[in-house]
Amino acid sequence: MKKTVFTGAATAIVTPLTESGVDYAQFARLIEWQIAEGIDAIVVCGTTGEASTLTDDEHKEAIRFCVEQVAGRVPVIAGTGSNDTAYAIELTKYAGEVGADAVLLVTPYYNKATQRGLIESFRATADASSVPCILYNVPSRTGCNLTPATVAVLAEHPNIVAIKEASGNISQIAELAHLVGDKIDIYSGNDDQIVPILSLGGKGVISVLSNIMPKATSEMCHKFFEGDTEGARRLQLDLLPLVNALFCEVNPIPAKAAVSAMGFCENYVRLPLTTMEDANREKLLTLMREQKLI
């Protein structure tokens, strides 16, 4: 088995933005709070971090800043995937140079590559990387599913160490665990499937929920690992209404609204994303009040 990047919960952290750019003062506050609350790792410039609307310079600077702010206290995983393999390689090399502990490589989107194309793209990026690579399968966003058979081929690469599985397809994830569970780590990419994926041998979750509940999300994982499966199950189900509210509009619109309500950023997202509808936001805030988050 390859070295595990992290065990437990990693926050797919929002990027605090204003009309003028990234708000690094608020970003620092959010990172510090995450670490104080016991998060196990931080993923910067992922889907939730609005990487797709950051400029190239902002993307690189956000990675560098996060690594510097965290200062080795927890692993930092940089989102460096792209539908342009050459650019993914450029970002991946940069992340390694500035000290990221690993990179997260989303399946190339829009191009609708064949499985052979996915294999060649991920291999090329992993070959160029100085740090471990985590694959990221999210077909609802990319229009392209990374099949278990393809992951089994990629799992033979020494630098590909894990996969974030956000397909939502438990049958596919079970097949994945059967094929590669002894070769690479599997992380849930969906907050409503943390415990089910842990039960298949998963090592944790790359989470949206942990933007606002890092301690509880980490505890859910560690309760399971420590044998308190009933406690983990209860947390999973108790937090389900809040999880659903965080996905009632496309991520990261609700996550940004929630983090904003806690005072860590402005409720600002870049077009084509728009801020949360008032009725949905009020439902989210009501659930947050019930959890004493605001």
Identify the residue ranges that each predicted region occupies.
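Alpha-helix N-capping/helix-start residues
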Residues: 19, 24, 56, 148, ...
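Catalytic alpha/beta core domains of metabolic enzymes, predominantly
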Residues: 127, 141-247
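Alpha-helical structural signal in soluble globular domains
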Residues: 61, 65-70, 94, 98, ...
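Catalytic cores of TIM-barrel enzymes
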Residues: 2-5, 37, 175-178, 184, ...
